């Protein structure tokens, strides 16, 4: 699969990613001990550089962030009193809960930070081989409130496509996301959302499901993995819907998908009237809509279970009202 952002091989079949994830970020026998730099120490007290391993070529995360801080100080965007945390958030290309600091190979890290410039981002990308993208962050990307419109971060250099290994009692999936357009969710075992979904499964309720604010598709696709016969995924934000279609393809073997059909190619970033963008069939009948959840059931058949996974603190009362046509609505 070609990456929709850079056209390269950033997106791999989920089963291949899962087969290699345990060793993806592991040190080799010749790697030096992790430097474990003090993240609160000012730049002036940090070492100038940390070498890569001569055998495997991988770099400790601290080495990459130190190199990035060096460039930002050099370009006047940080000063000698700033520390490693001031660089931004390091996001490994395939997110996975690690018990150890990651060792990074080429193009395996995205940096999302504030107060960055395009020239600095391009310098980081060209001079630090482990970095695959640099994002100017601020706020929560996506559509938090349909009345206020969307928020996007800015991809300053490189590629923003990354994936997360999502684990559950049903099995694991790899969920890819365009990170400058989709909010960050750190993968963790036993997450509250998965606990809710697993509880619904054990009550026999994950059979016919609408994931009304689906984002890149995490909950809806987990319902497919859990054995649902029909799943509808919907989002008002076009980048999320495009990520859903990508994730159907990436996870199709794990989900028992035999056929994926692309029906429409919407152009409006924020939808109003729902449009059926794609379908998939096999072990489960899957429909993907780009639309406002408040209007979804004018096009899609209601389900026995409707999941609403809104941003924390959002008022969901109106959405719950329109989802009354479903047998049960659960706020995740």
Segments predicted by a language model, with ranges:
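N-terminal cysteine/histidine-rich coordination modules
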Residues: 1-68
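Conserved SAM-binding motif I beta-strand of class I
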Residues: 230-236
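Non-catalytic substrate-recognition/targeting regions of SAM-dependent transferases
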Residues: 102-107, 112-187
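Conserved class I S-adenosyl-L-methionine
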Residues: 205-215, 232
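Conserved SAM-binding loop of SAM-dependent methyltransferases across substrates and taxa
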Residues: 216-230
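S-adenosyl-L-methionine
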Residues: 236-301
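Conserved alpha-helix/loop element of class I SAM-dependent methyltransferases that forms part
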Residues: 187-208
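Active-site segment flanking the S-adenosylmethionine/decSAM binding pocket
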Residues: 285-325
